[in-house]
C-alpha cells in the first residue's frame, strides 16, 4: 500500500498538471480564434481583406474611397469639370470657323464621340450632385411645375451648376453642328452663326435662319 501510494501521488499530480495545460491551451485557442474573428469582422467593416498567418494579419487590399474623396473637394471637382468641358468643345468650333470646308472638319463633325464623352461626364456630375431635395426644387410649385425660386436654390450648388454647364455645352455643340451641316448642304456662310452658338445658342440659330433667308432671296 505504501509503495502504491508513493507512485499514485506523483501520477495524480502529473495528470493534474497535464489537464491544466490542456485547459490553458484550449483557452488560448478559443481566444486566438475569437481574435481572428474579431479582426476579420473589423476588416470587413473597414473595407480591408486580410490573410491570417500564425495569429497575425496582413492588409492585402484597402478601399481608397474615403481617401479619394478627401483628395478633391466639391469646388475643385466642379472647377475642373467646367474647365475640361469648355476646353473639349473649343477645337470643334475652331475647325468649323477656320476651315469649314476641310475634310478633317467634316469628319470631326460627323463623329458622335464628343457627345458621348460629354454625355457620360454629365451623367456622372448629375449622379454626384443629386440630393433628396433635387426633385423638390425642380417641381416646387403646388402644380408640380418648376418655379424660379426652386431652380435658383438647386443651382446654388457648384456641382449642380457644373452639370448644367456641361448640359449647355452638349446642346450648343449639337446645334452648331446642325447649322454647320445645313450651311454645307445649301452653300450658306455659317461661321458667324456657329460662333454665336458657342455662348448664345438661340441667337446663333436665329442668325443662321436670317442668313439663309437673305441668301435665298438674293438668288430668286
From Swiss-Prot:
Keyword NAD: no
Protein name listed in UniProt: Protein ABA DEFICIENT 4, chloroplastic
Short name of one Pfam family: ABA4-like
Topological category with respect to the lipid bilayer: Multi-pass membrane protein
Cellular compartment(s): Plastid, Chloroplast membrane
A single GO cellular-component term on record: chloroplast membrane
Domain of life: Eukaryota
Organism: Arabidopsis thaliana (Mouse-ear cress)
The encoding gene: ABA4
Biological process according to GO: abscisic acid biosynthetic process; regulation of superoxide anion generation; xanthophyll metabolic process
Disruption phenotype: No visible phenotype under normal growth conditions, but mutant plants accumulate violaxanthin and completely lack neoxanthin.
Regions that span the bilayer: 77-97, 112-132, 154-174, 195-215
UniProt keyword annotations, A-Z: Chloroplast, Membrane, Plastid, Transit peptide, Transmembrane, Transmembrane helix
Tissue distribution: Expressed in root vasculature, root hairs, leaves, trichomes, sepals, stamens, stigma, pedicels, siliques and embryo.
Record function comment: Required for neoxanthin biosynthesis, an intermediary step in abscisic acid (ABA) biosynthesis. Probably not involved directly in the enzymatic conversion of violaxanthin to neoxanthin. Cannot convert violaxanthin to neoxanthin in vitro. Required for ABA biosynthesis in response to drought stress. Required for neoxanthin biosynthesis which is involved in photoprotection of photosystem II (PSII). Neoxanthin acts as an antioxidant within the photosystem PSII supercomplex.
Transit peptide: 1-37
Induction field: Induced by heat stress.
Further details from the record: Plants over-expressing ABA4 have increased levels of trans-neoxanthin.
